Structure formats: C-alpha cells, structure tokens
Design a protein with these regions (language model features):
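Structured, hydrophobic secondary-structure cores that serve as assembly/anchoring elements
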Residues: 1-311, 329, 344-353, 359-365, ...
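Conserved aromatic
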Residues: 49, 371-376
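Extended, Lys/Arg-enriched charged tracts that mediate electrostatic binding to polyanionic substrates
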Residues: 309-333
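Prion-like, low-complexity intrinsically disordered regions in eukaryotic regulatory proteins, enriched
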Residues: 338-341
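Surface-exposed loop/edge segments in extracytoplasmic proteins
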Residues: 364-372
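Short, flexible N-terminal segments of the mature chain
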Residues: 374-386
Length: 956
C-alpha cells in the first residue's frame, strides 16, 4: 500500500479502500452491417441498433411494398425495403446490427445525368404538347367587382412530363365558353364555399390529344376531391417500370386545402392555370442531393424603448435547429416549440431560461405529443444548461476525397432528431445576457404576384415565378401575362386589382382559438391544424408547405425579386385582450403583425414590457422544420433498382454513387466494426465486387451478395412475373464471367418468399436476407464456426432465418443444385417433406482450400479479431520474454476454448526468440506465429449398404 495518499501529522489510524475486484471491460459482440433503404431514420451514416424493437423505433417498420395510393403525400411504400428485412432476420436471432440507410447523394463532379433528385421529362413550358412540361399551378380567385382588390391563392400543382393541362369553362366578364391556360375561368357549379367550387380540367398527351377530363373541388369529403380524382403516384410516369395501360404523363403534387378554404367568401370563383417557372429556373426540376430540414433563425426580444422603430430583422439572431440527418421525414412529422420562457430572477445570474420541446407535427396545443424535451436551457456559453450543450451541435460531412466523415461541433448530440446552430456572437458570449428567444424567421416562399388595377396589360412584375405568355401550352393570354382577357386577343374592358399568393404557414392569431382548457395553453407561431370545425385535426397540406424549393432556390436565404421570408413572427407583436389584471397581465392575447411598431402590442407600453408577455403566460411559440429533401427519384418505385446501375459510374448515376458511398462509409475498421456485410437486393456486379474487396481489405468481414441472372423484383421493370424469374445457367455464367475468387464473399440462390409479421403481407426477398438470418441462428444455437446450412441450422421452413419463409421463386433440381455448388453458389433447396433449407456453405473462393467454406472463413475472422484485440493491449509494453509469456497466457486459453467448442482440431502458438529475433526487437516488433487446424463440416456422406447371403457372419 502506498502511503503517499495519506497526510501524517498527528498519531492516528488511517484507512483506505482499494477495489481490485472490478471486472475488465468486455468487447461488444460483432454483428453485420446492412446497407439499403428504410422507412425513415438516420441516413448515409452507420448506426448501431441492438434489437428489432430499437430498429423499428429508429428506422421504422420494414416495408413489404405493393402499396400505391397518394405517394406524393404519404411517401413511397411501393417497393420492399430489403435492408430492413435483413436487419430483422439478424436481430430476431442475434444482435447487434449496424445499418446504413441510403438516400440520394451525388458525386461532386457528377455530370447532369448523375445529379440526384428528380425532374419532369420536359422541364420548360412551351406551346407544343411534345415539348411542354414542368410544373403548372392552379390559382383560385374569388369573384369581385371591377377594380376591387381581390386576393387569390395557389391551390394545386401538377407536374407534367409532356402534354398539357388547362381549364375549361366560362371566362371572366363574358359568357364565352373556352378551354385553355393563362385565363381566368369560372367554376362550373354554384359553390357554397371556396372548397366546394368545382373546376373542369383537360389533360392532353404528347400528341395534343385529350386523354383526361376531370371535374374536381377541394372539399375533402367529396367524391370529386382533388386528391381522389387525379393521379398522385409519380411512379406511374415511369415507362420502364409501368405497363402501358397504367402509365400517366402527369401527377398531382402539392395541394393547399387550407389556403383555399380561407379565401374570402364569394358566389363564384375563378381559376387560372399558369406555368411555375421563370427565365432561369423551372418548378419541375429538383435535381440535387439529400439535404437536412431546418428551422428559421430564432431571434430575441426588443430590449429598447423605441417601439416605433421596431423591425424584427434588426433583432439579434440567437440560434436555429437543423435536422441531424438529411431527408424529408423530420419536417413532415416533427415541429419545435419554445416554451417556459422566463426572464432572469437572480441578480447573480443575468441569463433567462426556456425549454425546447420537439413535438409531433400532427398534434395540437390542447393535446401535445412530445417526442423530446430539453428543459431549463439558457444562452450562457459557460453554463451546463447552455442550449448547444443541452441539445448538441455536432454534425458530420462526407469527405469525397478522403472517403470518410469529418466531424464538426463542440457538444455531443443529446437529441435524436436535431442539432443546434448558435449565432457566432451568442456562442462567443458577446450579446446581452437578458436576451431570450422571442420569435423566428418564417420559411422562404415565392413572392406573391401583383397585377396593377386599371391596366390593359395586366402582366406580371419582374421576378415572379409564374408564366402565362403566348408560348405556354394552350395559353389564352396575350401581351405578356394578360390572362384577365375575356377571350383570346380581345383586351378586357375592366380590370381587377389582383394579388396571387403563394401559400404560407397559417399562424395562430388568438389565444382563444382551438379547444384549449385555458388561453395560456396556446402556442403562438405556426398552426398545423385545419381551420373551421375540424380545428384539432392535422392539416395535411402542412406536408406540402415544408417541402424543399426547386433547384436554383435556397430554402434558407432570400432571392431578390423571387423569394422572401413568408413572415417574421415575434411575441413582441402580441396584443393584450380582455381585462388587464392588477398584476398588469392579460388573460388573453392576439397576434397582430406590426403591432409593436404601431405601439399597440403588450411590449410597446414601456421599457421591459416584454416581461409582461411572459408574466401573462404567453411565453411559448412553435416553429417548423422545412426544406429537407431525400435526393431520390420519386418516379422510381425502387430508387436504387439494379437496371439503373448498368454501365454507370459515380459521375453518371446518383444511385451508383449513393450505393458506393454507403459501402465506403464502412470501409475503415477503426470507424465501424462488423463481421458480415450485405446490400440486400443489389446485383450490380461492380458494386458487389467493391463490397467483397472492402471486406477483404479489412480482413474481418464476410460479404453476402446477391447475384445477377436470377429473379428480378417487380420494381426493376414492367415485365410479368414469369419473365422475371431468371435461371440457374445465366446466374452461373454471369458470375464466372467476372472471375471472382475471394473467401470474403458468399452468394445464394434463389429468392424466397416470406411473410411480413407486422402487415401479414407476402413478399419476395433476396437470398442474402435469409442467409444473414441463418448465420444469426447458427451463432445463437451453436457457434459462428458451425456451418450455417442444413436442416439443423439452415431450415428456413423451421424459422432459422428469423423470418417466416413460405416458398422459393424457383424449385431447384438435384442437377441444378450441383451446378450451383460447383460454381460456389449456395443453393436454397425445397424438399417435399423437409421443407425449404439452405443447402450449401461455400465462399466465392475458387482456389481449393479450407477457406472456401463459410464456417472456416467466419472462424478465422473471429479468431483474428479476438487475438488482435489481445495484441492491442500489448502494444508499447517492453519487448521482453515476460511480455511474450503474458501474451501467450491470453491467446492459448482463448484458442483452447475454441477447440473445446469444436472450432479447431488443434492449434499451436509460437512466440519466442525464433520468431521475435534480436533484429525484430531492435525494430520494436513482436512477431508470433499461430498455426490453426480448423474443424471441417460434413457436407457429403457416403454409405455402403452391403447385402450378404443368409450364411454370412458379422463377427469381423
């Protein structure tokens, strides 16, 4: 015992505890890495999950595919997420599993064909059906008398590959019946509200022939509701995967139901179809990679006593929220509230406090659905409750040169969904301590369109993102955008003072709105509920309001003459309502834009009156996340289908780049550890070889690949099932042509049918999915070096895969199994009595050796990994015999344990002066030789049945 820790001055007994019973840290169990699509969750980075329930919580349910419907609004559920089923197969038997969810990314040097995202086939508006295309918007305007100011709204957007879309009906100020675009055309019925106004649309194909005539409205309960009567499935535009009978040339994208419902009441309404584009950019082009959603900047209260000069843009920016990962799920499903805003009360601590609450987007203020809560936050950079420290501010960016993620930020992320970006002055402690979050910048939107009253040339102002000239398809307008004409080429005798608005988020205007138990429960800021009687129901058009803008426009910065912030919300614009209390507070409040500058708000009554807003109980507001993008081609059922990858490179295909980057992300063994790797459903030979080469370079993982030539999934083309089955000979010849010779890869054949245990749907999955499950089953019930095949460990009918396997896409004959196994492809056999079984365990190594079997390769991976961990703890010790003995004292017992569990027949470890010579000692090297005799599995059984005569004896 050391006496240095004690201070001896006067006599006494000194006691200390020394705990030598602590257990050494154990290494985590290794599982597979699975790369592919998932419903939601972290994207383009490896994430570990330890159970299937954790997988569902993080990445959502596996998707069986086959679901059509409103894909634009509800998301793509039309193709299976094979990676999710592979993760399920493993996690049902074992754990953990590392998942890389794929989204669309692009090579920094990609050419136009290699850009991520999607676009319509023709992106520009023209007057010819064969070349016309892009985004076309329907604007709806209430009827009004001449020269009356009237406001209309963008109500819907259609996206056309070619052909055209236009209205049919009676034009304004005339009884003439016309069909066309760029002209105000009256509704076809007698509406009782803006939503019930009906319009007739005609849709032409590329030849100019009318293919669809549709009457629709915006009443959600009507059979003519716009989202019920138009195609909302973008994949139907894809001729490569859709049969001729099912093909469409357009789809309905955004609809803004609440904006239509809030139009002023009128006896009639007019619609006009205009192209959404300008001289440079097109509304039908979204060709860019995945990006994260983010909020607008949150800014402070006004600390001055000069309300007349108040401008929210002059307030101090404090922070904003950014999704941890790219994609659209966060913005469609989450919103953020700032609540419990409190002024400082302690003279020793001049900083106020507030809480951040991440809520479900579909909740309402009367019933919060809280996902995460971070309480008692402040803006003091030296505090443990500093906002960035409480939530986290770290993020990663992919370095395409070094092929790695670079990490930025100061504080680990505590939130599963967002990080904080602090204003630099706030982060440096250079702002007043009294500052608190009081408002936020609204999302970026296109500028509204104004037309001048009384002009005979009612053309649009510069920078407007609409077009209605003579050269857009079926235009009835002339002279720019003179769409107020009563008919073509005849100028109108009267004009409207007209504004066309691009929709924006509705804001809470009164604390008494909604079904709240108290006005103090109201969160000002954005409102994600419907208006009217259904006020507590989610407003589905919210999903369209949070979407990213087309290529060429920023979602965070204004573009002069084209886009601007929709609003600047601030609690400084709350006006008191009701009788003021003796404590100078208000029982209710209204949000009135510019009320502080007009000196009618609560906070405009004097210095520090912003505190009255908080004391009155209105210190909370809600802001959205916007602008996230998946970077995928929404016209694909399977955005990474193999038929898109043929003869492609990272520069010519975003799908190829995304898949390759997903593999590159897990190439470094110091970044992520795993023992198996798979990209389920991927049959592209070059990418599969890259996966195998990655595992071989690491030396610690086996790649499970799916082969070209077998079954092709329904999302690959528009062929019938019988034409997509594939065959054994093609699969073998395609593999042999590549000359693959590696013990770090394995392949199986054919695809199998499984039952989704959540939805009870039947689907076909690639063989790598069940192969992964079988390996987990073998590892759980025996050891990883036992052959993952045969009826004991590979019986798929008996549940060995972790999934319920019901069928194979092709029943293999004995000869076909022989041919597959001779080509190092492991057959999945189906027997009448025994059921479906994995009937082989070869690697893709052609050279005969013990390593041409999966159980031996997995044994070697395991042994190398464990002994390398032991060796790592020996580094920087003295290179002497005592150290060698210590190393042997750990390795030999470990190998004896493997031998005792039937992994090795025998072994020998040599570490002495014959291996670590004086020369190696001088070079700081310890060198050991480890000899292994792997235990082989029985794959062939020979039995001779000898028939003897009745007089033979068996004594010998």
């Amino acid at each position: 015992m050391s006496t240095k820790k004690f201070k001896f001055v006067s006599p006494g007994v000194f006691i200390s505890e020394i705990d030598n019973s602590q257990l050494p840290a154990t290494f985590d169990k290794l599982g597979p890495v699975v790369i592919g699509r998932a419903e939601r969750g972290p994207a383009m980075r490896p994430v570990r999950v330890d159970s299937f329930s954790e997988f569902i919580e993080t990445f959502g349910n596996p998707i069986p595919g086959g679901q059509g419907g409103d894909i634009w609004r509800d998301g793509n559920y039309s193709s299976p997420t094979y990676a999710a089923y592979a993760a399920q197969a493993w996690l049902k038997n074992s754990g953990p599993c590392t998942v890389v969810r794929l989204l669309g990314v692009e090579d920094p040097e990609a050419d136009d064909s290699g850009k991520a995202g999607w676009q319509t086939e023709n992106i520009a508006a023209t007057d010819a059906a064969s070349t016309n295309g892009g985004a076309y918007g329907l604007f709806i305007v209430p009827s009004a008398s001449a020269d009356s100011a009237v406001t209309g709204t963008l109500a819907a957007v259609w996206y056309l590959d070619n052909g055209g879309i236009y209205l049919s009906g009676t034009v304004r100020a005339s009884s003439d019946a016309l069909t066309g675009s760029a002209t105000l055309i009256k509704n076809t019925n007698s509406p009782t509200s803006p939503a019930t106004a009906e319009f007739k649309v005609l849709i032409d194909d590329e030849s100019g022939a009318t293919t669809d005539t549709v009457v629709f409205n915006f009443s959600r309960t009507s059979q003519r509701y716009i989202r019920k009567v138009f195609n909302t499935n973008p994949t139907l535009l894809n001729t490569a995967i859709t049969t001729t009978a099912g093909q469409k040339k357009y789809f309905l994208g955004e609809t803004f139901e609440r904006a239509v419902e809030e139009l002023s009441s009128s006896s009639d309404y007019f619609g006009v179809v205009l192209a959404l584009s300008d001289a440079t950019n097109n509304g039908g082009k979204f060709r860019f990679g995945s990006q994260p959603a983010q909020s607008g900047w949150v800014f402070s209260q006004d600390l001055s006593n000069n309300p007349a000069t108040y401008d929210p843009e002059n307030m101090q920016k404090l922070f904003k929220f950014i999704s941890l990962d790219t994609g659209e799920w966060d913005q469609s499903n989450l919103k953020i509230s700032i609540q419990d805003i409190a002024a400082p009360t302690n003279q020793d601590d001049p900083f106020g406090t507030f809480s951040v609450v991440i809520r479900r987007a579909d909740d309402h203020d009367g019933s919060l659905k809280v996902v995460e809560r971070f309480s008692n936050c402040n803006l003091n950079p030296n505090s443990s409750n500093y906002l960035a420290r409480k939530i986290g501010d770290r993020f990663v960016e992919w370095d395409s040169v070094e092929k790695r993620h670079d990490l930025f930020g100061n504080y680990d992320n505590a939130s599963r969904f967002v990080r904080v970006e602090m204003d630099q002055d706030v982060d440096a402690g250079a702002t007043p301590a009294a500052l608190l979050p009081f408002g936020f910048y609204g999302p970026i939107k296109f500028d509204d369109v104004d037309l001048t009253s009384g002009s005979t040339d009612s053309s649009l102002g510069a920078g407007a993102f609409v077009m209605g000239e003579d050269d857009i398809y079926r235009s009835l307008g002339t002279n720019g955008v003179n769409f107020l004409n009563s008919d073509n080429n005849n100028p109108p005798t009267t004009e409207l003072n007209l504004k066309l608005e691009f929709p924006e988020f509705p804001l809470r205007l009164k604390s008494t709105d909604g079904d709240l138990s108290s006005p103090k429960d109201a969160y000002f800021g954005i409102d994600s509920t419907r208006n009217g009687a259904s006020i507590n129901r989610f407003e589905e058009s919210y999903i369209d309001l949070v979407r990213a803008l087309p290529e060429g426009f920023s979602n965070t910065a204004e573009s002069a003459g084209a886009t601007s912030h929709a609003f600047m919300f601030t609690l400084d614009d709350l006006s008191g309502s009701g009788t003021q209390t003796a404590q100078n507070t208000f029982p209710e409040a209204d949000y009135v834009v510019n009320s502080r500058a007009n000196q009618t708000s609560i906070s405009s009554n004097g210095l520090n009156e912003w505190k009255t807003v908080l004391d009155s109980g209105f210190g909370q507001f809600t802001l959205p996340l916007v602008g996230g993008f998946n970077g995928l081609n929404i016209k694909e059922k399977e955005p990474f289908r193999n038929s898109l990858l043929t003869d492609k490179t990272t520069r010519t295909s975003y799908a190829y780049e995304s898949l390759k980057r997903g593999i590159d992300m897990v190439a470094d063994p110091e970044v992520v550890e795993y023992s198996l790797a798979t990209v389920p459903g991927l049959t592209n030979q070059a990418l599969n070889e890259h996966l195998i080469a990655t595992c071989e370079a690491r030396g610690d993982a086996l790649a499970l690949v799916d082969l070209q030539g077998g079954y092709e999934a329904a999302a690959e083309n528009n062929s019938a099932f019988k034409d997509r089955v594939g065959d054994v000979d093609t699969t073998i010849s395609d593999l042999l042509a590549r000359g693959v010779n590696s013990s770090y890869g394995a392949a199986y054949y054919p695809w199998v049918q499984v039952i989704d245990e959540i939805s009870n749907a039947l689907l076909w999955v690639p063989p790598s999915v069940v192969a992964l499950g079988v390996m987990a089953n073998a590892e759980r019930n025996s050891e990883l070096w036992f052959a993952p095949a045969g009826f004991t460990r590979g019986g798929l009918t008996d549940g060995a895969a972790g999934l319920r396997v019901t069928n194979v896409v092709q029943r293999l004959t004995s000869k076909e199994r022989d041919k597959l196994y001779a080509a190092n492809i492991n057959p999945i056999a189906s027997f009448p009595a025994e059921g479906i079984v994995v009937f082989g365990q070869k690697t893709l190594q052609v050279t005969p050796s013990a390593l041409d079997r999966i159980n031996v390769r997995r044994l070697l991976i395991y042994v190398k990994k464990e002994i390398s961990r032991m060796a790592a703890t020996t580094l920087f010790r003295q290179n002497v015999k005592k150290t060698w003995i210590g190393f042997l004292g750990r390795v030999n017992p470990f190998l004896r344990g493997v031998k005792a569990r039937f992994g090795l027949d025998d072994f020998r470890v040599v570490l002495d002066e014959t291996t670590t010579t004086p020369d190696l000692v001088d070079r700081n090297i310890m060198y050991a030789k480890i000899f292994l005799k792997p235990t082989k599995a029985i794959e062939f059984i020979a039995l001779d049945f000898v028939i003897t005569d009745s007089g033979a004896g068996f004594e010998d």
